[in-house]
A protein has these predicted regions:
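N-terminal beta-alpha supersecondary unit
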Residues: 9-12, 26-51, 165-169
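Acidic (Asp/Glu-rich) catalytic motifs at the cytosolic membrane interface
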Residues: 67-105, 214-233
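Function-critical hydrophobic alpha-helical transmembrane segments in multi-pass membrane proteins
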Residues: 133-151
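Solvent-exposed interhelical
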Residues: 146-180, 217-222
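Membrane-proximal soluble regions of multi-pass membrane proteins
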Residues: 1-24
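Multi-pass membrane catalytic core of lipid/isoprenoid biosynthesis enzymes
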Residues: 29-46, 86-132, 136-137, 174-190, ...
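C-terminal ends of transmembrane helices
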Residues: 18-23, 75, 95, 149-159, ...
Length: 250
């Protein structure tokens, strides 16, 4: 029962999908980050469904864009927007953290979101769906969430409140780190074997950037920064997928 509750906690927090409601406690939150990558499977499955449906190309590209937003409810985009505002302020660390707590959406957040979706839509329109590409993209969506969960358990926290702090303090960090590190390694090897190592490289590059920006600009990670990482990793991996197809690798 605790196993199923752990999955439900992950889906309740990081997706908009309806799941049974449980009282969150130490037991069912301990390994919630280990279940986080399962949401990537759902996103990938729906992405593949959109790929096989007889849709016009523009409609298919739009569907590819909307799938992750529909599944997650935009929780990661919210973090991306808030972090974009904070980084664009060029204020000190305290100022940036204050902006992250502000519920209002600033001008830079709107600009960055518009640019993000233009780039995402363009890349979705450039990707040719094949079963192999669909499998690689699904694995990539799982990988980015495995890396995000690993970061919550391994990277320093910027503050002692908020979403990242809640899950980090509730987690069995050593077990979570080992599990997600092993899962990430397996996914990276699988992607490389399928000829899409570029997607794995893009995810790792985004993780490296995430760590150094979080540490330098904010003193550690927050829930908003986790969303910022996830959206950037997804865009970079999508670009890698498109480039792999243009180069004839996939």
């Amino acid at each position: 029962m605790t196993f199923l509750q752990t999955i439900a906690v992950a889906f309740a927090m990081f997706s908009a999908l309806p799941v049974p409601q449980f009282e969150w406690n130490e037991k069912n939150m301990r390994y919630a980050m280990c279940a986080f990558p399962l949401i990537g499977l759902v996103c990938g499955g729906l992405w593949c469904l959109c790929g096989v449906l007889p849709l016009p190309e523009l409609a298919r590209a739009a569907a590819f864009c909307l799938v992750p937003v529909a599944v997650t409810g935009g929780i990661h985009l919210d973090g991306y927007a808030d972090t974009s505002d904070a980084l664009s302020s060029y204020g000190d660390r305290e100022k940036k953290l204050e902006i992250l707590k502000d519920s209002h959406c600033g001008a830079f957040a709107v600009i960055r979101l518009c640019c993000y979706f233009v780039a995402y839509f363009g890349l979705c329109g450039s990707v040719r769906f094949t079963p192999r590409a669909g499998l690689c993209w699904t694995l990539a969506l799982v990988l980015e969430r495995a890396l995000s969960g690993f970061a919550v358990a391994a990277f320093p926290l910027a503050k002692d409140t908020g979403l990242a702090h809640t899950f980090a303090t509730a987690a069995d960090k050593q077990t979570v780190r080992r599990f997600l590190c092993g899962l990430s390694a397996l996914l990276i090897l699988t992607l490389t074997a399928l000829g899409s190592g570029g997607l794995a490289a893009a995810a790792l590059l985004a993780l490296w950037r995430y760590y150094f920006v979080a540490k330098k600009q904010f003193g550690g990670i927050t829930g908003d920064l986790a969303g910022w990482f996830l959206q950037r990793a997804e865009l970079w991996m999508l670009a890698a997928l498109a480039v792999s197809q243009w180069g004839g690798v996939l």
